[in-house]
Amino acid sequence: MRSRVNERFRKAFDSLPEDIQRRARAAYARWEQDPSHPSLQLKKVHDKHPIYSVRIALGWRAVGILQGEDMIWFWIGSHAEYDRLLAQLRR
């Protein structure tokens, strides 16, 4: 499975604290080696669409949509923002 990011993700990533950016890069490296690695806590977060989340660090998540063999990461942020995003996606 390949991984890509969109512009929205890039902008959100750039606004993260440096420590979280480092952790996100480490999570990405883990994902490249094994998307099902337990530390990523990969889970499907939408009933109808192939939308998944992974854990970046305690209190931080990334969200993407699976399109064929590509995971398109479109969001990254704090867990509080993640909860709000999921509420919007599930409407």
Feature annotation, model-predicted:
Residues 2-4, 56-91:
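Enriched for short, Lys/Arg-rich terminal
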Residues 10, 28-31, 73-75:
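Tryptophan-centered motif/residue detector
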Residues 1-27:
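Arg/Lys-rich, positively charged N-terminal/basic patches that mediate binding to nucleic acids
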Residues 22-24, 44, 56, 62:
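Hydrophobic alpha-helical segments, especially transmembrane helices
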Residues 11, 35-40, 77-80:
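Residue-level signal for pocket-adjacent positions within structured domains
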Residues 29-54:
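A short, surface-exposed loop/turn module that caps and links secondary-structure elements
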Residues 12-16, 46, 60-68:
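Short, charged low-complexity linear motifs
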